[in-house]
Amino acid sequence: MATQRVLPQSKETLLQSYNKRLKDDIKSILENFTEIIKTAKIEDETQVSRPAQAEQDHYEMHVRAANIVRAGESLMKLVSDLKQFLILNDFPSVNDAISLQNQQLRSLQEECDKKLISLRDEIAIDLYELEEEYYSSSYSQWDTDLPLCEAYHRVDNWASPSSSSSSTQGDQEEVEILPSQETEPQHHLNGQGTSSLEKM
């Protein structure tokens, strides 16, 4: 059996005032409604004339109806005050709601972790099968220490002879240009070449 929480004195006094307001408003509504019903009853002849009595009853009904409306508005205000009191002071309920949300988030996190671990294991198995297939295929002529991406890159370069031949041809042209530049006669700054040497 849950133990009853002990409220501070200020909160206890506030709750007692709420309870008193509730009882007073309900009592006011009940009494005024009962008097309206009594006033609507047609009485026997009295010393007051019927027009005066009707006017008096009409005024009394208006007053008591206004009292009922005022008591109803007071009850609505009381409901609003109670909601505010519960929101600001009902810490156990707030803590329970936070704990429940934390449990839901933890369960969702555990589920996501399990899915990620399962996905990691599946990827590892597929990668192992791909490596086995690679090393047992024709690509195994390359260095087995190379990663798969670098080995495939080398195979692509080897499979395109046009690019490799053009690159080797460009290298040969550069090699041919360099010796030709070295065999050309060097001219002096004064414009005299080998002819000046022959004259000497």
Swiss-Prot record:
User: Could you tell me where this protein is found in the cell?
Assistant: Nucleus
Q: What keywords is this UniProt entry annotated with?
A: Activator, Coiled coil, Nucleus, Transcription, Transcription regulation
User: Which parts of the chain are coiled coil?
Assistant: 93-123
Write out the biased-composition intervals (Polar residues).
189-200
Q: Name one GO cellular component term.
A: mediator complex
Protein task: Component of the Mediator complex, a coactivator involved in the regulated transcription of nearly all RNA polymerase II-dependent genes. Mediator functions as a bridge to convey information from gene-specific regulatory proteins to the basal RNA polymerase II transcription machinery. Mediator is recruited to promoters by direct interactions with regulatory proteins and serves as a scaffold for the assembly of a functional preinitiation complex with RNA polymerase II and the general transcription factors.
Q: What is this protein called?
A: Mediator of RNA polymerase II transcription subunit 22
Which source organism does the UniProt entry give?
A: Takifugu rubripes (Japanese pufferfish)
- Provide the organism lineage as a comma list: Eukaryota, Metazoa, Chordata, Craniata, Vertebrata
Protein encoded by which gene: med22
